[in-house]
Amino acid sequence: MKSSVNIQDHFLNQLRKENIPVTVFLLNGFQLRGLVKGFDNFTVILETEGKQQLVYKHAISTFAPQRNVQMKTENEPS
C-alpha cells in the first residue's frame, strides 16, 4: 500500500533541512523572515538573528522561500 505524501510537511522539512531562508506572510499582513527550525501540526518555529519565534499555522498565509524547494521524494522516479 502506497502511503500518501503530506506536501506541507515535506515542504517545511526541506526548508528546515536545507536551511533555506524564508519569508512568512501572516494573515494580518505582517512578514517574518528567517529559518524554519521545527514544526508540528499546529506551529512553526522560525529563527531570526539568533532569536526563535513560535508561530501558529492558523495565522500563516504564505511561505516564500528565497530559492526553490526540492519536492521530489526519494522513492519518486526522475
Curated annotation (Swiss-Prot):
PROSITE patterns: SM
Keyword RNA-binding applies: yes
Keywords: RNA-binding, Stress response
InterPro entries linked: Hfq (IPR005001), LSM_dom_sf (IPR010920), Sm (IPR047575)
Entries under SUPFAM superfamilies matching the protein: Sm-like ribonucleoproteins
Role: RNA chaperone that binds small regulatory RNA (sRNAs) and mRNAs to facilitate mRNA translational regulation in response to envelope stress, environmental stress and changes in metabolite concentrations. Also binds with high specificity to tRNAs.
HAMAP family according to UniProt: Hfq
Protein name: RNA-binding protein Hfq
Taxonomic source organism: Halalkalibacterium halodurans (strain ATCC BAA-125 / DSM 18197 / FERM 7344 / JCM 9153 / C-125) (Bacillus halodurans)
Phylogenetic lineage: Bacteria, Bacillati, Bacillota, Bacilli, Bacillales
Gene designation: hfq
